[in-house]
């Protein structure tokens, strides 16, 4: 019997079945030795369910319900409107069946060869784990004693808690019936789900007949009733016994490991990657999976955007906008002047961080400098006066949280662009020296600071270019220094020495023609030549 519990019949889905989550990325299901996951994609085994395993699955479920309702699991009907469903509640006519499934989202309706049928199969495997009721699906039972405990556990649940919902329309004598889940009244003539374990008159809307723990629809209306609530088989079993997070089986041994609010068989509390025992050792939880320190650093450690080195799990880490830094004065500093920015406001710009706008402008690349044809609008934003960061919350979008390993540090960001908050990173209190030698991860692309010593900086020059006459939309006023002349004090405006003053080229309207001028006298020519000798045009 012990050899049977350790046998190869653990896999219900069959080797090579495709993964519904990963699709073509997974070559097919390859069962782990004792985990209920695929070794290729690491998805749970219910993600690899397929219609080819329906017979084995339904046979197991029929034993679970003592065979009394076998027909409802694979009920067939001569009516074409019912034959299109992979499963229908018993005792309903085609109109009532349509009324029942109309309450569900389309992706959860079990049409044959549809996403709803895959959803049903996945939920059957998840809500009613075969290894919760039959020893031949278990791989972690130690000896006949634990197999007998599993048998007694399954029989007691079947006798005291297991039931199947019955669907029927609400009659006129049951007016005022209220749904036990949402508290709303169920109208007369609408179909409702009745649970005999709950008592007479207790019913639910079809879409409200869900597990009290996971809030998922109770697949095929199979429920376990406990203390006035209905549960799926998985979560009801966890009310009675702890479940191993690694092998997904109910724990019947006298000893188990408890950490992070989860339970493990003592021998199963190991690194998810290398499977080294973690009892009494340091570990890190990621996605509900424990890792040893060396595997975690090898797989998930970040690299500092300043020095390019790996950030160890015991080193402080700052994150912002997808970038990471060591929480040290040598790494988290201004990219221009090198001043430490720990606990101070900083300005992120082009992959670098700066202490002020002046440093970011001085260290700007030629592409981002000002030119007559382009203007950096980010410098035109009106910013608030930001001081040294404190622990209290400040107003405006200029404040963003930067994550420090082990604690949250609020830093002021001199920027008006809203940035999403970064997730906190778990810290450990013990120390770990060095990084694993087998680490072969490449350093991510980073922006490095330019060599400022090889470039000569010149003062910023801003040039302006007046538009052409055809592009002038507004009037342009020019100011000139005022002067008086005794020979022209009584002349009309726009004339000088009796002659009209021509407009400059950039102020001439389209079709402008210069006013006629009289032939100058010899005296005027002499004066003009004399003036030209002492006048410079710039």
Swiss-Prot record:
Keywords: Cell membrane, Cilium biogenesis/degradation, Cytoplasm, Developmental protein, LIM domain, Membrane, Metal-binding, Mitochondrion, Repeat, Zinc. It comes from Xenopus laevis. InterPro entries: LIM1_prickle, LIM2_prickle, LIM3_prickle, PET_domain, PET_prickle, Pk/Esn/Tes, Znf_LIM. The keyword Cell inner membrane does not apply. This is Prickle planar cell polarity protein 3-A. It is a peripheral membrane protein. SMART domains: LIM. Involved in the planar cell polarity (PCP) pathway that is essential for the polarization of epithelial cells during morphogenetic processes, including gastrulation and neurulation. PCP is maintained by two molecular modules, the global and the core modules. Proteins of the core module include the proteins Frizzled (Fz), Disheveled (Dsh), Van Gogh (Vang), Prickle (Pk), Flamingo (Fmi, Celsr) and Diego (Dgo). The core module proteins develop subcellular asymmetry, accumulating in two groups on opposite sides of epithelial cells. Residues 435-449 have a biased composition (Basic and acidic residues). Residues 475-488, 514-523 have a biased composition (Low complexity). GO terms for biological process: cell projection organization; establishment of planar polarity. It holds the Pfam family LIM. It comes from the Eukaryota. Disulfide bonds: none annotated. One of its GO terms (molecular function) is zinc ion binding. Residues 369-398, 433-463, 475-538 are annotated as: Disordered. The keyword Transport does not apply.
